[in-house]
């Protein structure tokens, strides 16, 4: 992703242009110069000049989706996989509004994105009217007010003379500090106006008080230079003194572009590694330091390792509720918690209590840690704790022997285990939320180089197909396929993008978990409302099509399985099929997510949540006590 130094070089290149150009062409050229290569769009009259310019610009490839939500989700997935920001182009009114869900997902998960929306001409903007009206222009919507809480920067361009300044500011903010989406809303008469780029004022982050490449004005205690080195040395000293330290890396590792240095750091530290939710692909299952996946729907070994630790080093993970549960007071209760984050408020939010908050960027902190580890020798107690945690990994697998006894339907945990046995290293696997994500994160045995992700913060249904599209366009030309794990409920939310996959010739292998509805809410209703179901399947108002006929209609190869004995055949046929293919698995509706954190309702109606080490189905108390007995 482009940063400050690259930005200054690109900024200089545009100043040589003296000819008058259409503003829309200027925007397209500038984002291409900044490093944007793909634009995900749905055309519309309010954005017609932007559509035309983005379709003409050298160095830009436009990808047409059938819904603006899908375009935004595809752009998010593209940036997540490639490390390169994408653009989204939508029209005014409903076009912009439709994109909000995907933009929100990028905001929560810290993914850079620039949205370029069309808008009605300036004279018909409602805020220019002499009286207060709901709408003045045709299809007008005051989109920037709607998106300000889910973007880092959102503005309606009011003068052609401001375009360079606003565009440069938007691009800088999207990738600086904690990345996220930005939004430029451009009225149609401004899109078509002629400008002289050399006469336009630019954006200077230092002159505006941003101070340095990453920090936002007023942020707490930003560490650089000697202060950062001292902090790294202090962390190393604390780890050396600990007996049961755990390293919890999050998605911030890849966002910061320090994946390879992180692996070096982990090896030098030699302590247990328990990746956070959605960062499970940072280390393969056979990594010698990997002890499990902690979280509310993680595994027992990962949660035992974290809950019994005496030091927890959190790098690039914001410790959200899905990670630490609603019983956040009971999270890693005996651990000294050290957290490094680029976004200062995350260090001080009310759901966590951090002993050593470090406000720094992982781009500089990880190298500082590696430097501080020169000559370091890990205490023998650290290896003892890793061995202890590894033994619990072996003792408490996610896929239990009794799951294989299922008849007439497929157990999703068993299917996922078989699928990942068949997948190759370096595969890219995108997930929907709910069953497709929860079961996969628990049961998948990842190989070196595999990428596995969903959107975690928004966790919206409908992410699977758009994410597949975005991932494919981020993959190298040598890629032969992209794997999509979808749910029957989720896939319906952006059903139309099946045609986008077929139309663009994307060799997507879609594994469709069919549990006759919304299994996550079904489990909730069964647990808290005596089995009374509302809106979670065919028996409570939500119906689904025959997906075999759907596959045929769109032109997908199709296979199905409802027996364990047939799973390997179905997986092999799908992976070997030329082009796009769907494998539908009819899975056991009686299989709940397990293990998982459980809550119970008290007599006064309030809820109480069990701690992370005490997952449902609950272990016998004596077994739990023994499992948590740590080495001296």
Where is each model-derived feature located?
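Phosphate/pyrophosphate-binding active-site segments
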Residues: 2-19, 161, 209-215, 338-433, ...
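N-terminal alpha/beta PP-like core and its mobile active-site loop of ThDP/TPP-dependent enzymes
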Residues: 2-376, 422-425, 479, 507-510, ...
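Active-site diphosphate/adenylate-binding microenvironment
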Residues: 24-27, 32-35, 42-45, 50-54, ...
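Conserved structured core elements
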Residues: 44, 229, 256, 263, ...
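Thiamine diphosphate
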Residues: 116, 124-138, 296, 350, ...
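Short, basic/glycine-rich phosphate-binding loops at helix/coil junctions
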Residues: 145-147, 391-397, 549-551
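Generic enzyme active-site microenvironment
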Residues: 183, 339, 431, 485-486
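Active-site metal-binding loops of divalent metal-dependent hydrolases
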Residues: 251-252, 317-318, 434, 487-489, ...
